[in-house]
Structures are given as C-alpha cells and as structure tokens.
Amino acid sequence: GPRAAGAAVRAFLRRRAGVRPERGQQTAAAVVDWFPYATTGGVPNAYLHAGHLFVAGTPCRVSTILGSCVSVALFDPVAQVGGLNHFLLPQGPENTAPSARFGTIAVPWLIDALVAAGAQRRALQAKVFGGACVLRAFRTTAGNLGTKNVQVAKAILQAEGIPIVAEDVDGERGRKLIFQTHDGAAWVRSL
C-alpha cells in the first residue's frame, strides 16, 4: 500500500543521498509523507502541506492549496505511480540545507522518488499548477514570486525531458488542487 511504497522511497533516497542529515536538516526521505484523512469511493485522500512531497504506487487523491506556491504533479500512466510536490520559493539562499520548500530541490526530489517507487523516467508526464500573484501590490511587478516559481518548475522539467501535458498557472487567485496519483487526473478550483 501507500505506506509500504513510502517506506521504500525513503530507504532508496537515504541510500542515494549517502549522508545522514544533521539535526533539523531536511532530506527527500523526510518529506515523502502520508497524511490520510478520509476515503472517497474506496480511494484514500491525503493532504499535502507546503514544503512536502507525496508519492504513491496505489490509487490516492492528494489535495493541496496553492497561491504563489507551485505544485508539480508527475505520473507514469503505465506503472500507475504518481506524486505531487508543493514548493514555496524558486530556490533557497546559498549555504541553506536542501529543502522541498525550494523548487530547485522539490522537483528533482519528486522525480527521484517516483523512479524509486517504480515509475519509468521516460514515461513520466507532468502537470504544473499554481504560481498566482495573490497580493495586489505585486500585480504590476514583472517577475513576481509566482511567475518565478512556475519558470523554475518548467525549466527543470524541460531539462529532464519530461513533457508538461497540462497546466493551470499564473493569475490573481489561489487554487485548490486535487490530483489522482494512479491516472494523473487533476481538478482545480479557484479560491
């Protein structure tokens, strides 16, 4: 089930990293979490918090709330493995411990976690969500935080050769996202 898949992903990422995190330091293994809260039609639901990622090799619906943050949803339609991240900033300051709060870390960690859970890298498809400019004061500013988050996500996916098959980005309103890990279906509602 999802908990076993999560444990396998965490073990793989610990081995791949080859280092033990210091106290308070985040690793990909530490942010692949399972937050079950109900089932709908026999499919478990999970809520994804900002700065985390979620991967499942069994059917699951993952929801999150986005403003200027971005979520990249990845899925392998053949292996029926999918996952979602939720990052807040395009990148962290220099000399900052790696964290899924940053797009430059969260997107590669999500790719690695999906491959560890059984997805084939060449079969991965992406959907990108979020990146709104929700603060009125910044709406006239070119290159607002939401736009930068979207740009980072798209650049990494392009560099990794992962096609973006759908997106709902930018704008002035937040979004509620629900993503199904097993088939890549996604629903977005403006807030």
Could you tell me what each predicted segment is?
Residues 2-8:
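Extreme N-terminal basic, low-complexity initiation segments
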Residues 27-40, 44-64:
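Phosphate-centric recognition/catalysis
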Residues 48, 79, 101-105, 109, ...:
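Conserved active-site and cofactor/substrate-binding residues in soluble primary-metabolism enzymes
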Residues 62-117:
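Conserved mixed alpha/beta catalytic, RNA-binding, or beta-rich assembly cores of soluble enzyme
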Residues 123-130:
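Short glycine-rich phosphate-binding loop at a beta-alpha junction
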Residues 135-147:
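Phosphate/ribose-phosphate-bearing ligand recognition and processing surfaces
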Residues 146-191:
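Divalent-metal-activated hydrolytic enzyme cores
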